[in-house]
């Protein structure tokens, strides 16, 4: 099920690799390599979050679909969860401990496009505790995936 506002705003295909360990092995990623060149860490972290959300979605109790969102201006949201009833949650993944208002740009655009169906936008980061960034927007630590 795809919400009309998502289609109209520009849902774009993105390949999500189902196993971040396998992806890391294929890319030759190691702690040493990532420490020297962090450019591969962001995509690995996004894949890890996608895998965790996919696992948890299997026991959610309501059907849901996972998407990547990109609009005509190339603003994006790493992961959009849409329930069978049309509720939407956007997740942006940041490989950083610091978050600023600009990190919510794609989530704000998704919220505007989807109106009341948009329930929450989260920037997952390496921070310590949740911090509100406006109406239905919050920065939260990665550990919230298991809370």
Regions found by a protein language model. Give the residues of each.
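Low-complexity, glycine/alanine/valine/leucine- and proline-rich hydrophobic stretches
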Residues: 81, 89-90, 105-109
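Arginine/glycine-rich "motif VI" loop of SF2 helicases in the C-terminal RecA-like domain
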Residues: 58-59, 109-117
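Active-site-adjacent loop/helix micro-motif of nuclease/hydrolase catalytic cores
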Residues: 97-107
């Amino acid at each position: 099920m795809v919400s009309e506002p998502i289609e109209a705003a520009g849902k774009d295909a993105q390949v999500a690799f189902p196993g971040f360990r396998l992806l890391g092995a294929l890319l030759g990623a190691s702690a040493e390599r990532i420490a020297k060149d962090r450019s591969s860490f962001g995509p690995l972290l996004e894949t890890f979050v996608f895998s965790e959300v996919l696992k948890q979605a299997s026991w959610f109790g309501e059907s849901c679909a996972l998407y990547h969102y990109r609009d005509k201006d190339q603003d994006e949201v790493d992961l959009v969860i849409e329930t069978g009833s049309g509720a939407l949650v956007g997740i942006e993944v940041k490989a950083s401990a610091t978050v600023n208002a600009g990190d919510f740009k794609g989530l704000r655009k998704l919220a505007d496009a989807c109106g009341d169906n948009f329930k929450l936008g989260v920037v997952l980061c390496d921070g310590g505790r949740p911090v509100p960034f406006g109406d239905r927007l919050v920065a939260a630590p990665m550990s919230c995936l298991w809370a």
